[in-house]
Amino acid sequence: MIMDVIEIQKIIPHRYPFLLLDRVTQIKENESLIGYKNITIGDNVFQGHFPGHPIYPGVMILEGMAQAGGILAFKSMGNMTEEEAASKVVYFMSIDRAKFRAPVKPGDRLEYRISVIKNKGQIWVLDGKAYVDDVLVSEAELKAMIVDK
């Protein structure tokens, strides 16, 4: 399943400038998701991080992983309608073992690879990895819960 940014916005509430997922290229419900964000010098974050030496912030990479994980959790919840999805939100409970292995710069395509470690009811434990040109740049374990708004 491929999702463009319009489809993504039907599932998660994030909007510019905080929507950090441009496209989902693969979803295997209850298993994994692959998606990406194109990093451009026009991203607002580069106005201050860092002038003359732009580096995409690690916390933004983690947030992008979280958004991708939210899509995976929603899509794995069965045949949830757009209306049902609109009445729910994903809260992240913890981010553990976060590591940043290489800088991400303007011009990079940041690929998120998210996989389910465990799911029990509304609680999801996910393994998140971020790559640029198949080089691991960041990883973390994410725990999230889907709740009513």
From Swiss-Prot:
One of its GO terms (biological process) is fatty acid biosynthetic process. It catalyses: a (3R)-hydroxyacyl-[ACP] = a (2E)-enoyl-[ACP] + H2O. Its EC number is 4.2.1.59. Keywords: Cytoplasm, Lipid A biosynthesis, Lipid biosynthesis, Lipid metabolism, Lyase. NCBIfam families: fabZ (TIGR01750), PRK00006.1 (NF000582). Involved in unsaturated fatty acids biosynthesis. Catalyzes the dehydration of short chain beta-hydroxyacyl-ACPs and long chain saturated and unsaturated beta-hydroxyacyl-ACPs. This is 3-hydroxyacyl-[acyl-carrier-protein] dehydratase FabZ. It comes from Sulfurimonas denitrificans (strain ATCC 33889 / DSM 1251).
